[in-house]
Regions:
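Repetitive helical segments and hydrophobic/amphipathic motifs
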Residues: 13-14
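Beta-propeller folds
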Residues: 9, 18-295
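Positively charged n-region of N-terminal signal peptides that target proteins for export
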Residues: 1-6
Length: 295
């Protein structure tokens, strides 16, 4: 996709989100489906997905367009795949499994594992709760990886939750209870499950999740760019020990830079960097500061 189309698509996505009621502000999927036509899908919390068509020339928005081959359909789904995502050239799909990042070739169905340290507290390409809820947004469905336009690289966030406090969340649904017949407080990227004898196996359960309250430790974040042809990961030149937030990243049209937004935890300064997928070095692009805070 050329730069003109990228800019048009960005403007269209922003305008549709701004003018529509009850939208999440990020579409869950979008794709060019004609020379001047963009298809978008938005998630609704209670009523499901809704499709739109946007004409890039006239700006006309049409609701309820259903294309014969919905662009979120997949030819197959690898076992355990989470956030299955097409490459821009439609020859591969990326996904996470067991908190590691994978890619699968559509023609051969051959899978390649790209990260290897995923665990209950190390999440590769899958958001820690605070990033899902407060930064990347719920419409991402915890997805924290991004294909390059040339389909040769994937940028991703690696979250270390080991210092984030564990917080219990009660679920009223019986299907969330431990199948063994005991009440169980079980882990959602939290570490170990904890038996709770007074929890009814048919009346609900308690989920333990990594949840940073105000002043608690946030997850440490590293930003990786993996070359899917040779498996090499270049790590962006940021200190993961800094108390900071990274916003939603984006690729340059030439796939030569991965653009990262960074803020300190006080959120009164915003810096934009271009990160090299070759060695992870960063170039400062933009700086903004405000006396209170920046969104």
């Amino acid at each position: 996709m050329n730069m003109k189309k990228c800019l048009i698509a960005l403007v269209l996505l922003m305008s549709v989100a701004a003018s529509a009621k009850d939208f999440n502000d990020v579409p869950s999927a979008w794709k060019w489906v004609g020379k001047n036509e963009v298809a978008l899908t938005y998630d609704y919390s209670f009523t499901g997905d809704k499709d739109f068509s946007v004409n890039a020339v006239t700006g006309k928005v049409t609701e309820g367009i259903n294309y014969p081959a919905k662009f979120t359909d997949f030819p197959f789904r690898p076992e355990g795949a989470v956030n299955l995502t097409y490459s821009p050239d439609s020859t591969k799909m990326a996904f996470t499994r067991d908190n590691n990042l994978w890619v699968v070739d559509i023609a051969t169905k051959g899978e390649t594992q790209l990260t290897f340290d995923g665990s209950d507290v190390i999440l590769n390409g899958y958001s820690s709760w605070v990033y899902y809820e407060e930064i990347l947004g719920r419409p991402t469905h915890y997805c924290a990886f991004w294909w390059s336009p040339d389909s040769k690289k994937i940028g991703f966030y690696r979250f270390d939750n080991s210092e984030v406090p564990v917080f219990p969340i009660y679920s009223p649904f019986a299907e969330d209870a431990d199948r063994s017949g005991m009440g169980l407080a079980y882990s959602q990227n939290a570490g170990a499950a904890v038996a709770l004898p007074n929890v009814s196996p048919t009346g609900g359960s308690v989920r333990m999740t990594r949840y940073p309250k105000c002043g608690d430790n946030n997850p440490k974040v590293r930003i990786g760019i993996v070359n899917i042809q040779n498996g090499f990961t270049a790590w962006a030149d940021f200190d993961e020990n800094d108390d900071q937030y990274f916003g939603t990243p984006f690729w340059g049209a030439d796939s030569e830079s991965f653009y990262i937004q960074r803020e300190p935890r006080t959120q009164n300064t915003l810096d934009l960097y271009a990160v090299s997928p070759v060695d992870g070095s960063k170039k400062h692009i933009y700086h903004e500061t405000y006396k209170t805070w920046l969104d």
